[in-house]
Structure formats: structure tokens, C-alpha cells
Amino acid sequence: DKIVGPGNIYVATAKRAVFGQVGIDMVAGPSEILVVCDGATDPDWIAMDLFSQAEHDEDAQSILLSWDADFLDRVAASIERLLPSMERETIIATALRGRGAMILARDLDDAIAVANRIAPEHLELSVEDPQAIVGRIRHAGAIFMGRYTAEAIGDYCAGPNHVLPTSRTARFSSPLGVYDFQKRSSLIMASAAGAAQLAKTASVLARGEGLTAHARSAEYRGAVEPAAEPGLS
């Protein structure tokens, strides 16, 4: 009844094709990382964090956001120096050219606003006090807090689910979790007195829509005098 889990473009296309006949968790796109950094983290660490998503796929998205222009330059230098040592150099280079960016924000507030607009799959808060700003992050699949919390440990062993919303869908969806394997039913039970009270409202609304059977179904149980049909005196 439901298909869940990650996959490549073929899996995503298949899930989209059967949606409506069965349930799905989400249609996931290429991997994404957004790093918000105050400029005090080792630039080699940040460069490798960007590589960690870029090596997945040539369409992967890797973005660094900082309000320290000198730090952006240092990370750019780290990327240039470290890239030739990567086994997936060609894939990483293609991804960074196509969907990589280093963005200079005005300040921390501007960086948070941009991060919420991007709504990334993975968000690293590589700052001195991530607890002070995490409450202002509204849209992100998984949030990695502090300089030592690399996205890679979330991929493999830190514990969060690795099936995360991509392509800005973190604005309205969440990581795969136990609630994706549950469903709910609404329960309604009215007493005779309750039916009599609610029938008055239901009758007026139903007759206003011209749905007489709805109205009379409620009126029978509530012993309500039928409301006048719209337009009739």
C-alpha cells in the first residue's frame, strides 16, 4: 500500500507514476547541502563537506553561505587544492560548476533568511552557538549543529533518517519517520442532545449549498424544523 525509501532518478520517476494508486513518502531529487558558517571553521572541513554531497551526483547541490568574504576566499582555495585528490573528482567538479555556490550574506540574519528560502535537504550550522539560531530555521530536512557535526555522520551513524525532502520541499514536508507508517481515522459520536444542537448548524449550511439530503439527514436526528430553501419565503 505504500512505497518508501531513497533511489535514483528511475526510482523517483516510478514512485511519481504510481502515486495515487499507492502511497509514497516523497519524490526525492538530487542530494543537497547548505553550510552556514561564521568564518571560524577550518576551510578544509567546509570544502570537504561541500564535496560530500557533490560526489553523489553531477546534479547535486552544494552551497556555502557566510558573511565573511575572506573566509569564502579561503574555502575556494581549499576546494582548488583538495579537489584533485578526490576519487570522484570529475563528478564533484561537474556538480560544483552546475549547482555549487558560495554566497556572501550581509550578516547572520540575512544568512538565516536565505537558508529558509533555499530550504535545503541538509543544513550545517557551522557556527559558535548553533543553539542560539536553530529556532529560527523553519525549513530544512536535517540540521547539523556545530563545527564538529559533519553531514556525513548523519548519513551513516548519528541516527536521523536519511530519507529527507529535497528541491525545497522541506517547506512543507518532513524526513521519513514513524508517522509515515501510520494513518489516522476521524472518530465522531453524537448523543441525542448533541445531534439536536449540531443539526441546526448542519441544516442551515447544507441547505445553503442546495444539498437537501444532507440537511434532512441531520434534521431527522435532531428533530429540527427544516430551514427555508434559499430564495424562498
Curated annotation (Swiss-Prot):
UniProt pathway annotation: Amino-acid biosynthesis; L-histidine biosynthesis; L-histidine from 5-phospho-alpha-D-ribose 1-diphosphate: step 9/9
Gene3D superfamilies per record: 1.20.5.1300, Nitrogenase molybdenum iron protein domain
Binding site for Zn(2+): 53, 56, 155, 214
Catalytic activity: L-histidinol + 2 NAD(+) + H2O = L-histidine + 2 NADH + 3 H(+)
Keyword Kinase: no
Keywords per UniProt: Amino-acid biosynthesis, Histidine biosynthesis, Metal-binding, NAD, Oxidoreductase, Zinc
EC number: 1.1.1.23
Active site as annotated: 121 (proton acceptor), 122 (proton acceptor)
Stated family: Belongs to the histidinol dehydrogenase family.
Name of this protein: Histidinol dehydrogenase
Name of the encoding gene: hisD
